[in-house]
Amino acid sequence: MAESKTFNAIIELTALFYHRPGAGAADEEVAAWYQAKGRLYERLADHGGPEAAQERACAAASYEHARRLFAS
């Protein structure tokens, strides 16, 4: 998958870490974070490699967690 911008996994993981919602955050905020986590895992999986299947599973789990939070 060609991307117009260079993907730097370390920068993306660091940003995700620092934007993680704290205790008491609204469900919508936490769900949005899980969606961002899912997108990151999808991008990692798109680069292929031996962990691609596991990364896709993590993306799916993140999206499902977000869906449940939005539904509550």
Question: What does each model-found stretch correspond to?
Answer:
Residues 1-72:
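Long, non-catalytic architectural segments outside compact domain cores
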